[in-house]
Design a protein with these regions (language model features):
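Extracellular polysaccharide-targeting segments
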Residues: 1-42, 149
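Phosphate/adenylate-binding glycine loop and adjacent helical scaffold
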Residues: 37-42, 48-150
Length: 150
């Protein structure tokens, strides 16, 4: 015997079964948990890829320090969360928590560097990093999870 399509309701009256598309159901779930990882990969996955953008399809942010050696950027979530979430950053290269794979261009040394969560609200996360020198540019490759569980 196989059972599918359960619907639980409060009260004594049963209503018609509510059908939702995959996209609608996913959007409702993302109010509680969201990840940038491709489907089928868990948080912190080690792609062990010199060029992580080929395999893991990470978030890529360009940072430029103008008058200081630190900078910050706001990154929006796919859907608004039910509460301010706990955000964890992972390197797109090897899954190291709290770091991003940093491409520093010609003459620079590519490596994992810290990418810090400065502030979270229901709509976005503010991320910050140190670039090491004024006017130095870098690209940060990372994944994230955002948890706003009950």
């Amino acid at each position: 015997i196989e059972f599918t399509g359960y619907q639980l309701e409060v009260g004594s009256e049963a209503t018609a079964f509510e059908h939702r598309s995959f996209g609608e159901e996913l959007s409702l779930c993302q109010r509680y948990y969201e990840t940038s990882y491709p489907t089928g990969y868990s948080a912190g996955h080690n792609f062990n890829d010199v060029y992580p953008f080929n395999t893991s399809k990470p978030i890529v942010q360009n940072y430029i320090a103008s008058d200081d050696t630190t900078t910050a950027i706001s990154y929006p979530f796919m859907v608004n969360k039910r509460a301010s979430p706990t955000v964890t950053i992972y390197s797109a290269k090897d899954g190291t928590s709290g770091q991003a794979w940093t491409y520093k261009g010609t003459g620079g040394t590519n490596a994992n560097d810290a990418l810090n969560v400065i502030q979270t609200i229901e709509q976005s996360v503010m991320l910050g990093c140190s670039l090491g020198a004024v006017n130095q540019a870098s690209e940060k490759y990372f994944h994230y999870t955002a948890e706003a569980e009950l």
